[in-house]
A protein has these predicted regions:
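Hydrophobic alpha-helical transmembrane segments
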Residues: 14-19, 59-60, 88-93, 115-119, ...
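Alpha-helical membrane segments and adjacent membrane-interface helices in multi-pass membrane proteins
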Residues: 37-99
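Short helix-perturbing small/polar motifs within transmembrane alpha-helices
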Residues: 79-126
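Hydrophobic transmembrane alpha-helices
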Residues: 2, 7-52, 57-60, 95-106, ...
């Protein structure tokens, strides 16, 4: 009985990892698998990863995989402009914030708490990623902090809407699965 529960948990973890990795490849960079340009889901996937996987080893693995995707994309398409430099480290911090917030809301059943933490995490992660890119990447050598913030705000609505759309889709899907599982369990009793 305990062995079966343990194996079921392990199976769920690996299934979660495979799905997250697939979605990251599907939505990141120049979209290596499709010609359809899907919005980047990385922020949402790191929040979901924090909820489902929790352990730092999974965060490190997922971040390393995101770097590999970017490097492969750069090698296949030189017009794809993502600098792998000091500004790129902002993604490590941003993704870490999403992971941390995800781990904090992993067991919540409150949609209000889920949305509030997701919004807060997304805003903080966006602010850090855009500011580190603008100020540290070398792409804008003369940019001031004020100009960097103004430039970042131009991209906030689009990034926020995409990230929250993915996160809310996850909430809806997992809620349906949870309800289905609970109703099957109740029927069996």
């Amino acid at each position: 009985m305990i062995y079966n529960s343990y194996m079921n948990l392990i199976s769920k973890k690996y299934t979660s990892v495979v799905v997250i990795l697939f979605l990251m490849v599907l939505t990141r960079g120049s979209h290596l698998l499709t010609s359809v340009s899907l919005p980047d889901a990385s922020f949402a996937l790191f929040l979901i990863g924090g909820m489902l996987l929790k352990k730092p080893k999974w965060f490190i693995s997922l971040f390393a995989f995101s770097v590999v995707i970017d490097l492969v994309t750069l090698s296949m398409n030189i017009t794809y402009q993502i600098p792998i430099n000091l500004g790129y480290l902002g993604l490590l911090v941003s993704y870490g914030i999403m992971w941390f917030f995800g781990s904090r809301i992993a067991n919540t059943k409150s949609v209000l708490k889920f949305v509030a933490f997701s919004v807060l995490a997304t805003l903080i992660a966006f602010l850090i990623s855009t500011q580190t890119y603008n100020l540290l990447s070398g792409t804008f050598p003369e940019i001031t902090i004020k100009q960097s913030i103004q430039t970042g705000w131009e991209y906030l609505p689009q990034s926020f809407i995409y990230t929250m759309s993915y996160i809310m889709a996850y909430w809806g899907i997992q809620s349906l699965f949870r309800r289905q599982f609970v109703s099957q369990k109740a029927t069996a009793l």
